[in-house]
Amino acid sequence: FPKIKDIDFIINRRGELDLTANKKYISNTETSYTLLRGRNVTLYDIRKEVISEYVKPEFLEITNKRQFVEKDRIICQQISNINCEKRLKFALCPSNHILGNSCNFIAIEDNKYGLDIHALLGILNSNLLNWYFKLISSNNHINNYELDELPIPLFSSNLHKISDCVQKYLLHKSPETLLNIDYLVNEAYGIKNTDSRNKKITNSMDNDLSYIIPSIRTNT
């Protein structure tokens, strides 16, 4: 499976506003641009109740990431405790939100594979990729170079199903739909032997996982 770093229509970057160096652009007065920090990001959601900061429009004149501010993108925390069971927590970020550098973002362009922003969101939030990330990450940061190493099932026929399921989950937040997303993602990677109840990778998946990531065994 190709990794994010090898896919030219997926852009993986750090949040555009340096919370220290660009502090003068942060305002408590409402503007057209909401500031999001890492603490605002949860699994599939943005904690709107803790949003109280905005960004002055002048900031857009100095950032080289303006084009990403003006479109929907996927975001995650830049710091996540290494001991957390679920380290990868991605959410859909609407346009006109500016990200502090305590966030990472992933943008996606139109492509011939049928991979849209919702399908990619479901893949990134899967328990499988969370498991994989925990194998390759050795600190509390969610680094862009680590996200670059995540494999994406570009050629799967499940991409449209994953997208539909994610959109359904965003509307209704059904636990059953969340499990269905994980099932479809696992299937997209050619994996069918999972324990959905415990959301864990089982030993019987050893051969499948070796196919996806040959250099890593399940006993790592």
Predicted regions and their residues:
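Polybasic, glycine- and aromatic-enriched phosphate-binding surface used to engage nucleic acids
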Residues: F1-K161
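Non-catalytic DNA-recognition/assembly elements of restriction-modification systems
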Residues: F1-L19, T31-V41, L154-T220
